[in-house]
From Swiss-Prot:
EC number: 4.1.1.31
Source organism of the structure: Escherichia coli O157:H7
Protein's recorded name: Phosphoenolpyruvate carboxylase
Keyword match Lyase: yes
Top EC class for this record: lyase
Entry's Gene Ontology molecular function annotations: magnesium ion binding; phosphoenolpyruvate carboxylase activity
Keywords, sorted A to Z: Allosteric enzyme, Carbon dioxide fixation, Lyase, Magnesium
Active site positions: 138, 546
Length: 883
């Protein structure tokens, strides 16, 4: 195992050395010496040397304003390079890939060894695989796109340097290229100057498709096919592509006034334009490759006399002309020109698929399967995965916006105020209107700007080509009328098909009521007729954890899913659970495999639909090889969860979870909501107020500009606590509840739950991961530097709680130290701490200076502000999950 890390360590130290040379060239020897001194002090402080820890604090406190930025940037850039080395390590033959035999092969062998599973059953499970990844632009992808491109190239250099047979001159060339890339990064400003617009965010998503997924998805399918052939003697059908990508960028308007109907329309056009651009490159390759003459009578009939000489090329050139005409029309539309639709405009995937598939069948029939299964097969699979829209989008809006729109309408019509009606009256009105043949919206009505926006969005959905919008998600859904209201608004816009509408249940109360709401909906005949046996429900992870703490939230999520699965099964409805997880633990983030196997039995029958957020998109899909590895992990987990579902928890375990949930929620809310010192403590001990200055995402950090913790979005709430290393939202309440149950004499039962129930063991594993990343001496330093002395006792109390929590978690898990069963992650955290610690100490110092200046009525020093932004980005890179 250590050999495995030595490759990682040597890459990290080599990149560090090059960064050091870059700093020396740019700023001179003295700055490099300063950085080196700090690094050595940090390393020895981590090893337990208290004198050096004190010296580290003093050194960083005494930096002049001119030294702040270079030091902050040095450690921040180092962490970006370490992340790049680690990303490469996860796919390099000397690293993780070496000790990680193919995950799909492993899963298939495991399934084949189960006497109760026939090969036919496994095959059917493969055929019903469905994985939809929903890319969201959370304001947590801190790293700028230009730097991401440079890091991708650094990765490519590391890969080539790993080649044993490389000639000296090639080695020198690669090292020179690495130096150039690292110098370019050093001389690039790592902090965006302007907030990205929703269109910028969408373009970031398209860049991920182009740079990674476009190649990664066909590679993943080749890998899957190879493993299935080897283990089951089964070939994937050409049209079988179990993975789809959807995006919230440009569609998610919940709390983001910058996402308007016009923006959504623009992003839909842009997405189609990008698809034509990428498919044109593919077709260009096929025009040059498919020069064959021999073809089936069917293909020759299709091309006629004109194309008989080179039938495949003839078809490809025709398709190329259609793509070019489509692209030109989309380009004009994006510029705001209104043009008639050209002959042959591509709007549906079948129009792309048919000519390509005709070529494929003909090549196979004429004994040219080797050619058919080359680039042509990859393009066919891209048509199935990306198609004409490239990525579909979800629309998301808050339930009250629909209620307010209908209220305004009913008041105008003089039939009362929809907003004040009872739930029964709302439902009666909605069902009546949904069944009515006449339109509800009056022609000359002039609604308010807010209502007009809701109606315009429905109009955009109705006009978009079918298949380009995946679902309409209703956040803060609480009642059946919330769902029916959206169906009515869509009907009024003239939508010609049943759009999937997914309620999102996200607070503790809403999760607890989710099953009742869905049961009522499924009892409405009109609704049953509309959905045709399919229902999507979204489970919110971040808001429930912010509302009730992580233990109560995760149990409420489990129970809501469990009840919904059983209700839909009984009603004969195929349920797709849509998981709104984040990258960090407080937002439901867990290693994919463990997280999926810890869900209730049957939760993946309708496939997996999950959000992939901000910075996690880059960690999981930043390179084609990593895409293959991430998709394979998901595939293995879905197959395993469906064929070897986890056991139903015992009744006594459920009772213990109920108890843990109540105790932990009370403790969590006791601090967060009821302790009068809590909000002032939070505001001063973390960079929460300063985070608002970072031009991260296009949406505001708060739903309402004033207000306490409840008005903060879940992401800044977690982001702030991650910065000061207390990681509070991801553990508060959980350990205390466990301790109480242990004191009641149930430790052996908790140990059994940890051993035999994946849901519970995953919860504990996630707590261990958080505790491994948290750091009490740093959290204490923030208090000393930034918090009013009267609030120190609260900080001490919270840190003591965490210490107690760590002990109880280790006792139940029977571990001697944190992360004992995941040494690779422990190693990775230790490697980073040496570089993250100075950034934390420096951040506390910068916050101190910035707030002092504000108190004294001075203008903030731009050097301090800039260095502060860099520490925020650097710590986010060091923690590997932001919010």
């Amino acid at each position: 195992m250590n050999e495995q890390y030595s490759a990682l360590r040597s890459n990290v130290s080599m990149l560090g050395k090059v960064l050091g040379e870059t700093i020396k060239d740019a700023l001179g020897e003295h700055i490099l010496e300063r950085v080196e001194t700090i690094r050595k002090l940090s390393k020895s402080s981590r090893a337990g040397n208290d004198a050096n820890r004190q010296e580290l604090l003093t050194t960083l406190q005494n930096l002049s304003n001119d030294e702040l930025l270079p030091v902050a940037r040095a450690f921040s850039q180092f962490l970006n390079l370490a992340n790049t080395a680690e990303q490469y390590h996860s796919i390099s033959p000397k690293g993780e890939a070496a000790s990680n035999p193919e995950v799909i092969a492993r899963t298939l062998r495991k399934l084949k060894n189960q006497p109760e599973l026939s090969e036919d059953t496994i095959k059917k499970a493969v055929e019903s695989l469905s994985l939809e990844l929903v890319l969201t632009a959370h304001p947590t992808e801190i790293t700028r796109r230009t730097l991401i491109h440079k890091m991708v190239e650094v990765n490519a250099c590391l890969k080539q340097l790993d080649n044993k047979d490389i000639a000296d001159y090639e080695h020198n060339q690669l090292m020179r290229r690495l130096r150039q890339l690292i110098a370019q990064s050093w001389h690039t400003d790592e902090i965006r100057k302007l907030r990205p617009s929703p269109v910028d965010e969408a373009k970031w998503g398209f860049a991920v498709v182009e740079n990674s997924l476009w190649q990664g998805v066909p590679n993943y399918l080749r890998e899957l096919n190879e493993q299935l052939e080897e283990n089951l003697g089964y070939k994937l059908p050409v049209e079988f592509v179990p993975v789809r990508f959807t995006s919230w960028m440009g569609g998610d308007r919940d709390g983001n006034p910058n996402v308007t109907a016009d923006i959504t329309r623009h992003v839909l056009l842009l997405s189609r334009w990008k698809a034509t651009d990428l498919f044109l490159k593919d077709i260009q390759v096929l025009v040059s490759e498919l020069s064959m003459v021999e073809a089936t009578p069917e293909l020759l009939a299709l091309v006629g006399e004109e194309g008989a000489a080179e039938p495949y090329r003839y078809l490809m050139k025709n398709l190329r002309s259609r793509l070019m005409a489509t692209q030109a029309w989309l380009e004009a539309r994006l510029k705001g020109e209104e043009l008639p639709k050209p002959e042959g405009l591509l709007t549906q995937n079948e129009e792309l698929w048919e000519p390509l598939y005709a070529c494929y069948q003909s090549l196979q029939a004429c004994g040219m399967g080797i050619i058919a299964n080359g680039d042509l097969l990859d393009t066919l699979r891209r048509v199935k995965c990306f198609g004409v829209p490239l990525v579909r989008i979800d629309i998301r809006q808050e339930s009250t916006r629909h209620t307010e729109a209908l209220g305004e309408l009913t008041r105008y019509l003089g039939i009362g105020d929809y907003e004040s009606w009872s739930e029964a009256d709302k439902q009666a009105f909605l069902i009546r209107e949904l069944n009515s043949k006449r339109p509800l919206l009056p022609r000359n009505w002039q609604p308010s700007a807010e209502t007009r926006e809701v109606l315009d969005t429905c109009q955009v959905i109705a006009e978009a080509p079918q298949g380009s919008i995946a679902a309409y998600v209703i956040s803060m859904a609480k009642t059946p009328s919330d769902v029916l209201a959206v169906h009515l608004l869509l009907k009024e816009a003239g939508i010609g098909f049943a759009m999937p509408v997914a309620p999102l249940f996200e607070t503790l109360d809403d999760l607890n009521n989710a099953n009742d709401v869905m049961t009522q909906l499924l009892n409405i005949d009109w609704y049953r007729g509309l959905i045709q046996g399919k229902q999507m429900v979204m489970i919110g992870y971040s808001d429930s954890a912010k509302d009730a703490g992580v233990m109560a939230a995760s149990w409420a999520q489990y129970q809501a899913q469990d009840a919904l699965i059983k209700t839909c099964e009984k009603a004969g409805i195929e349920l797709t659970l849509f998981h709104g997880r984040g990258g960090s633990i407080g937002r439901g983030g867990a290693p994919a495999h463990a997280a999926l196997l810890s869900q209730p039995p049957g939760s993946l029958k309708g496939g997996l639909r999950v959000t992939e957020q901000g910075e996690m998109i880059r960690f999981k899909y930043g390179l084609p090889e990593i895409t293959v590895s991430s998709l394979s992990l998901y595939t293995g987990a879905i197959l395993e969860a469906n064929l070897l579902p986890p056991p139903e928890p015992k009744e006594s375990w459920r009772r213990i979870m109920d108890e843990l949930s109540v105790i932990s929620c009370d403790l969590y809310r006791g601090y967060v909501r009821e302790n009068k010192d809590f909000v002032p403590y939070f505001r001063s001990a973390t960079p929460e107020q300063e985070l608002g200055k970072l031009p991260l995402g296009s949406r505001p950090a708060k739903r309402r500009p004033t207000g306490g913790v409840e008005s903060l979005r879940a992401i800044p709430w977690i982001f702030a606590w991650t910065q000061n290393r207390l990681m509070l939202p991801a553990w508060l309440g959980a350990g205390t509840a466990l301790q109480k149950v242990v004191e009641d004499g149930k430790q052996s039962e908790l140990e059994a739950m940890c051993r035999d129930w994946p849901f519970f063991s995953t919860r504990l594993g996630m707590l261990e991961m958080v505790f491994a990343k948290a750091d009490l001496w740093l959290a204490e330093y923030y208090d000393q530097r930034l918090v009013d002395k009267t609030l120190w006792p609260l900080g001490k109390e919270l840190r003591n709680l965490q210490e107690e929590d760590i002990k109880v978690v280790l006792a139940i898990a029977n571990d001697s130290h944190l992360m004992a069963d995941l040494p690779w992650i422990a190693e990775s955290i230790q490697l980073r701490n040496i570089y993250t610690d100075p950034l934390n100490v420096l951040q506390a110092e910068l916050l101190h200076r910035s707030r002092q200046a504000e108190k004294e009525g001075q203008e903030p020093d731009p050097r301090v502000e800039q260095a502060l932004m860099v520490t925020i980005a650097g710590i986010a890179a060091g923690m590997r999950n932001t919010g």
